[in-house]
Amino acid sequence: MLFIFNFLFSPLPTPALICLLTFGTAIFLWLINRPQPVLPLIDLDNQSVGIEGGARRGAFQKNNDLILYYFSDAKTLYEVFQRGLAVSDNGPCLGYRKPNQPYKWISYKQVSDRAEYLGSCLLHKGYKPSQDQFIGIFAQNRPEWVISELACYTYSMVAVPLYDTLGAEAIIYVINRADISVVICDTPQKATMLIENVEKDLTPGLKTVILMDPFDDDLMKRGEKCGIEMLSLHDAENLGKENFKKPMPPNPEDLSVICFTSGTTGDPKGAMLTHQNIVSNMAAFLKFLEPIFQPTPEDVTISYLPLAHMFERLVQGVIFSCGGKIGFFQGDIRLLPDDMKALKPTVFPTVPRLLNRVYDKVQNEAKTPLKKFLLNLAIISKFNEVRNGIIRRNSLWDKLVFSKIQSSLGGKVRLMITGAAPISTPVLTFFRAAMGCWVFEAYGQTECTAGCSITSPGDWTAGHVGTPVSCNFVKLEDVADMNYFSVNNEGEICIKGNNVFKGYLKDPEKTQEVLDKDGWLHTGDIGRWLPNGTLKIIDRKKNIFKLAQGEYIAPEKIENVYSRSRPILQVFVHGESLRSFLIGVVVPDPESLPSFAAKIGVKGSFEELCQNQCVKKAILEDLQKVGKEGGLKSFEQVKSIFVHPEPFSIENGLLTPTLKAKRVELAKFFQTQIKSLYESIEE
C-alpha cells in the first residue's frame, strides 16, 4: 500500500511530466478535431413514401405539397439573377481566361447592365417583349451566352439555344420551327453558315445576326446582300445603352426557354419550359442540399458541360440565386484540368464519361502489384469512413494517395453531382472515397427541366438514382409488352410536378405521346422501386426492337452493362428483326487497351491492337463475361464485334449534343461492317 501511495502522490520527474502533458494534449486535440460523422436525415430503409394513385414522394418531404420556389424574392430567372446581385453585394459573377493566365471576372452589375443594354437594342430594332419572341443563341459556353440569355429574361423574351454541334440541317429546322428572326452567335464561321442558309432561301425568316467575336466588312456586306443585318455584340450593347428601355420582367408562368432536344432519330423537338419549371427544380435542389450544403457567394462552379444540358443551366441558376461565381472553361476539353486548377471550383457538375476517364487513368497508373494494393486499400479505408458519415480530405490516405486526384480538380470541390447517364458502381464508389466531398447521382431529362430524383445524403450505396425531389412525384406504369408491372414495383417511370414541361413547340402529337391528360410525363425509361424506396433504372421502353425469335431487346440497357468492361470506351449494340442474334461495334479505350492486350501477349500501336484478331476475341470474351455478371440473358449477349479505333463523337455525327448515341446514324455508318459480321456468323 505504501508503494502505491508513494507512486501516486510523489512528484514526477520533469521528463515524465512533459511526456504526460504532451500525451494529454495530443489526446485533447484529437478529441476536439476528430472528424464528426454526418448522420442520415431520413430512414435509409424507407427513403420514399407512397401516396394516392400509386405514386411516391421523397421521405424528406414532410407532406404532399410540391415546392414552387426556395426564395420568395426569386420566382423567375430574372429575379434569380437580381437576387444574386444583391446577396453578392455586386461581387464577381462570370469568369473567363486565356491560356496560362488567371481568371478575369465580370461583376453581377456589369452582367445585369450588359443584358439590359442588349435587350434594349432588340426592342429598339423592333423585337417584342413577348412570349412569341424567340431569340436564338448559337455559341459555345462563355460569358456572353449568359448575358444573351439574361437579356431575353429581362424583357420577357424566350431564349432558344442552337447547340454548337446540333448539325447544319437541325439548325435550319429549329430556326424555321421557332420562327427565329434574330440569332446571337459567337464566331464568324457560324455567322457565315447562317448567312449561307439565308442565301439558299433555307431560313427566310432570319433578319438579324449579332456576333460576339470580331468580324470583317466582307461578312457584313455579304449579310446585307441577302437582307441580314450584322451587328457586333459591342455595338448592339452601345445602341441599347443609347436607346435604353426599362426592364419588362416575366411572370413565373411565362416561357423562359425552348430547349430543342436532339433526338437519336427524327427532327429535334422543342421542349417548352417556363420560369416556374426551372425555378421549382432549382428550389427542390436547394431544399435537398439544405441540411448539408448551403451555397454562398464564395462558391464557384465551372461551366464546361454544353449549355444544351438543362442540367448545366440548372446548376448555374442555383449558383446565381446565392450570389456565387461561374468560371468558363477555355473551350477545349483537353485544357479542362488546367482550367480546374486555375479556378478551384467548389461545385462540380459532371457526367460519367468524364469520371470514367479519370478513374481509368488512376487505375492504369497503378501498374505494380504494390501500387494496386495501396490504391485499393485506400479506397476501401476511405469509403468505410464515407459509409460512417465522415466526409473529409485530410486523412492519411488523402495525403498519400488521393491528394493528386483532388488537386487535378482544383482541390476545393465541396459538391459533385453526376447525371445525364448511368455511372458504374466502382467509379461512383471511387470518387466518393477519393474526393472527400459530397458526391450525388441525379436522374432526369429535359422534359422535367433537369432532375426528378437524386441520391440521399447518408446513402452511399450505388446502382440507383435515389428518390423523388420535392418539386415532383414519381410513379411506375405497366408496360405489358415488356412484362413490367407496377404491382411488382416495375414499370415506365412517369413524373408529375412543377418541373414538368408544357409540351413540344408546335407539335401536339408528340406532346400527347409523352404528356398524358392527367399531367404525367412518360419518360420512356423503365424503373424499379427497390425495397428501401429508391429508384433503379433497369431498362428503356424506347429504342426497343424484336429479334427474329420474338425476344424484345433494349440495346441501351445492354450497352450500359457492357460499359463496365475495362478495355471499352464506347459500344454500340445492333440487332435486326430478321436476325436471331446481336452484334456490336466497340471502341476501345486507348489508355486501357495496351495493358489489356499485354496480358494475352499482344503488343503494338493502338491501331494495330484494334485490328488484331486475338485482341478482338479477348474483348468479346470480356464483354460476355461482364454481360453475364450484369444479368444479361443469352439472347442479349453480342455474338460478334467489330473493333473501331475512332470514338463516336458529336463532330462525326454519331452522338447527340447530350452525348447519346444516334442509333440510325451509327447503323448507317457501320452498315458494311454490320453486314460482314452477320454473314461471317451465318456461314
UniProtKB/Swiss-Prot annotation:
Its EC number is 6.2.1.3, 6.2.1.15. It catalyses: a long-chain fatty acid + ATP + CoA = a long-chain fatty acyl-CoA + AMP + diphosphate; (5Z,8Z,11Z,14Z)-eicosatetraenoate + ATP + CoA = (5Z,8Z,11Z,14Z)-eicosatetraenoyl-CoA + AMP + diphosphate; 15-hydroxy-(5Z,8Z,11Z,13E)-eicosatetraenoate + ATP + CoA = 15-hydroxy-(5Z,8Z,11Z,13E)-eicosatetraenoyl-CoA + AMP + diphosphate; 12-hydroxy-(5Z,8Z,10E,14Z)-eicosatetraenoate + ATP + CoA = 12-hydroxy-(5Z,8Z,10E,14Z)-eicosatetraenoyl-CoA + AMP + diphosphate. It is a single-pass type III membrane protein. Induction: Expression decreases in response to fast and increases after high sucrose diet. Its main location: mitochondrion. It is found in: Mitochondrion; Endoplasmic reticulum; Mitochondrion outer membrane; Endoplasmic reticulum membrane. It is an enzyme of class 6 (ligase). Catalyzes the conversion of long-chain fatty acids to their active form acyl-CoAs for both synthesis of cellular lipids, and degradation via beta-oxidation. ACSL5 may sensitize epithelial cells to apoptosis specifically triggered by the death ligand TRAIL at the villus tip of the crypt-villus axis of the small intestine. May have a role in the survival of glioma cells. May activate fatty acids from exogenous sources for the synthesis of triacylglycerol destined for intracellular storage. It was suggested that it may also stimulate fatty acid oxidation. This is Long-chain-fatty-acid--CoA ligase 5. It comes from Rattus norvegicus (Rat).
